[in-house]
Amino acid sequence: MNAGIIGLGRYIPEKVLTNLDLEKMVETSDEWIRTRTGIEERRIASDDVNTSHMALAAAKKALADADVAAEDIDMILVATVTPDQAFPTVACMIQEQLGAHKACAMDISAACAGFMYGLVTGKQFIESGTFKHVLVVGVEKLSRITDWDDRNTAVLFGDGAGAAVLGEVSEGKGILSFELGADGRGGKHLYLDEKDHTIMNGREVFKFAVRQMGESSVNVIEKAGLSKEDVDFLIPHQANIRIMEAARERLELPVEKMSKTVHKYGNTSAASIPISLCEEIEAGKIHDGDVIVMVGFGGGLTWGAIAMRWGR
């Protein structure tokens, strides 16, 4: 049995915060932000929109796309570091709101790699025959944990949600291979402080990300018995255009074969990969049978990569 994505959905907040807006809030400039990160604007959820609201909206779209009823979902996994509260989890909240009453539900905290962790977890339950359908959501309200007076981090983050329904797919399709990893020794480089503000050692995180994104991408290709020439599209975590480009160059892919949404959404952590995948599918850039590599890294430090052949 092969597990793969059979439905996708996303939620993007309406409010746009541009680099020019940030120039009025903190000592920075549009040119400085664009040249160092590739970000031009990001979306910010309104005060009355919580993480669970965004997760629910993306989940409903994914279920509709998969043509799967909520009552047929066996497990809900929500990847987030910005839950509404410690408990109940976002997964349990949307379980109730969706009416997915037979599903078990839990949140996963692996920062920007969380969606990868969720997909791999769901894959195991489906391919073991334990569950038939697993809903995986990556969602963040990072504006809530951003220090808007810190020019180094205020320019980076945005809010949003992406969701995928996992189910059985045809032989040769779906998730072909994966790699998950963590290195707690690097936790001090990216963390939440006592004021609930994101603190980042940009230089160290950059070095880690460039190395690990490239290595993990190559590893999953080899595990799947493929070569770089077999890869049709790269969906990297949308953290920084320079990190993304390093991963693309490691795979020797042309620019048009890499997803880029960082310029309009910023870094949405666990939501960035599903949002990007959803947009590329809708734009017709990914076709049935295409080999996709998805790769992300995050606080922990954590990382994850997946090689997938698209289609049902």
UniProtKB/Swiss-Prot annotation:
Signal peptide: none
Active site positions, chain numbering: C112, H237, N267
Keywords: Acyltransferase, Cytoplasm, Fatty acid biosynthesis, Fatty acid metabolism, Lipid biosynthesis, Lipid metabolism, Multifunctional enzyme, Transferase
Alphabetical list of CDD domains matching this protein: KAS_III
Catalysed reaction equations from the record: malonyl-[ACP] + acetyl-CoA + H(+) = 3-oxobutanoyl-[ACP] + CO2 + CoA
Keyword flag DNA damage: no
Function in brief: Catalyzes the condensation reaction of fatty acid synthesis by the addition to an acyl acceptor of two carbons from malonyl-ACP. Catalyzes the first condensation reaction which initiates fatty acid synthesis and may therefore play a role in governing the total rate of fatty acid production. Possesses both acetoacetyl-ACP synthase and acetyl transacylase activities. Its substrate specificity determines the biosynthesis of branched-chain and/or straight-chain of fatty acids.
Name of protein: Beta-ketoacyl-[acyl-carrier-protein] synthase III
Organismal lineage: Bacteria, Bacillati, Bacillota, Bacilli, Bacillales
Designated gene of the protein: fabH
